[in-house]
């Protein structure tokens, strides 16, 4: 069962998570857009690295919102969809983004927001999102 919601993430902590995600992207030579949202899915912080495709802006925000609103990584939706059959129902969920790269941000066992990245392959987006999430784990 997913963690409960806690007090929403603030700007300073959101910037810290984004900075860790961007550092991971830079080390690997990837250009990314990163979005951090609060528990309601509202944007708290956003940054687009130089040379990031503009389409990644909306995708990063969507991944972050999905992870916050559904309390799970977007990869969970990707995996369900890949299974086909009843998993295709995920396409009918408003706000679901079935592509890896969105991860809930958890502090003290409670979801405080989520981070979403876009710009690379979905596995690269996920790797950077997890780096951002790992930066705030208490």
Feature locations, PLM:
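Flexible, solvent-exposed loop/hinge segments and secondary-structure transition points
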Residues: 1-138
């Amino acid at each position: 069962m997913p963690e409960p919601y806690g007090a929403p993430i603030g700007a300073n902590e959101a910037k810290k998570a984004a900075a860790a995600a961007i550092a991971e992207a830079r080390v690997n030579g990837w250009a990314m857009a990163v979005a951090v949202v609060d528990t309601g899915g509202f944007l708290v912080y956003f940054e687009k690295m130089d040379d990031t495709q503009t389409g990644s802006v909306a995708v990063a925000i969507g991944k972050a919102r999905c992870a916050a609103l559904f309390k799970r990584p977007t990869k969970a939706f990707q995996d369900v969809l890949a299974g086909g059959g009843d998993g295709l129902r995920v396409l009918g969920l408003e706000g679901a983004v079935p592509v890896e790269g969105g991860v809930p941000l958890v502090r003290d066992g409670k979801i405080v927001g989520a981070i979403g990245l876009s710009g690379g392959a979905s596995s690269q987006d996920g790797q950077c999102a997890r780096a951002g999430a790992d930066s705030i784990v208490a």
